[in-house]
A protein has these predicted regions:
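Leucine-rich repeat
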Residues: 2-209
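Amphipathic alpha-helical scaffolding segments
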Residues: 71, 261-264, 285
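A structural signal for leucine-rich repeat
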Residues: 106-110, 131-140, 158-166, 182-190, ...
Length: 295
């Protein structure tokens, strides 16, 4: 009889998880896919709106197996419409397949104040997700960090300043519709301080015009094991630059203006294409310089 009573007590014991503070519930739900976090709204009245207030959302196409007949972009758009948190610290999209509707199905449905936005595409290299940044969307006004990685092709249209708060921009293996798209993207970031640009894919001859008066840290790298002859030309106008990191065996680099605030530089380039570069770096306090000879 005692065992039976004990069993009844166990079944009817209070729901301790539901009694946890919201901050802890947010941390727990942030560890699982958004689709699973949304399913917790069926547990009880207490859980109905918990997921809607999450400060961090991660959409991974590989883990969204319970979204029914909706496509991944449709699911993201609809769930973002339901999200109610006034502040969204981080939004991450991890794509597996090609999608060209991010700018129409997802961007307009972000209603929270967004601080960090990350898009990663892991699909086949021959399939690029084209992203066109639309005109003056409010979601981009508060963005502080933007990270784009993988098989993404950026097409930046003419628009008013749309990243007026962006401080850090990470572009890893990202292609551009044309050279103007890259320039337009930077011109839309009037307070940009950190630029990380990594090339893993062959884009042929490409001019990267970096003219950002507010830029303080610039990193441009090409993966060490990648030795193709596709040539990048970087024209840099960054009078506020303090930290510089460059590694590219075939690239050509030129500095349009002096950089009087530069205190640290790590440069690994081919000497024959960058003979004037050492003179630009003579006043740097901390310098690491590797000049590769012509082959």
């Amino acid at each position: 009889m005692e065992a039976a009573r004990s069993g009844i007590e166990d079944v009817t014991s209070p729901d301790r998880i539901s009694q946890l503070p919201n901050d802890l519930l947010f941390r727990i739900l942030s560890l699982i896919p958004v689709s699973d976090a949304m399913s917790t709204s069926l547990l009880s009245k207490r859980w109905k709106s918990v997921w809607k207030m999450l400060p961090t959302l991660v959409y991974n196409e590989n883990s969204c197996s319970n979204i029914g007949s909706l496509g991944f972009d449709q699911f993201c758009g609809r769930s973002l419409q339901l999200h109610e948190a006034p502040l969204l610290k981080t939004l991450t999209l991890e794509l597996r397949k090609q999608t060209d509707s991010l700018d129409s199905s997802i961007f307009p449905n972000i209603h929270s104040t967004l601080l960090e936005f990350s898009i990663k595409s892991t699909g086949y290299p021959v399939y690029y997700s084209t992203i066109s940044f639309p005109n003056n969307l409010d979601v981009f006004q508060t963005l502080v960090v933007l990270k784009l990685q993988g098989n993404i092709c950026l097409d930046v249209v003419d628009s008013p300043v749309c990243f007026q708060s962006l401080k850090s921009l990470y572009l890893t293996c990202v292609n551009f519709e044309n050279e103007e798209s890259f320039s337009k993207l930077l011109s839309a970031c009037p307070v940009l301080e950190d630029l990380f640009l990594q090339r893993l894919c062959s884009v042929g001859r490409f001019l990267f015009s970096i003219s950002v008066p507010s830029l303080q840290r610039l990193t441009y790298t090409k993966e060490q094991a990648y030795y193709s002859n596709d040539e990048a030309i970087l024209e840099i106008t960054a009078p506020s630059l303090k930290h510089l990191n460059i590694f590219d065996r075939v690239g050509v680099f030129s500095f349009i203006e002096d950089m009087p605030k530069l205190v640290e530089a790590s440069v690994r380039v081919k000497l024959s294409k960058n003979e004037k570069l050492p003179k630009v770096l003579t006043s740097v306090e901390h310098l690491s310089l590797d000049l590769y000879p012509s082959m």
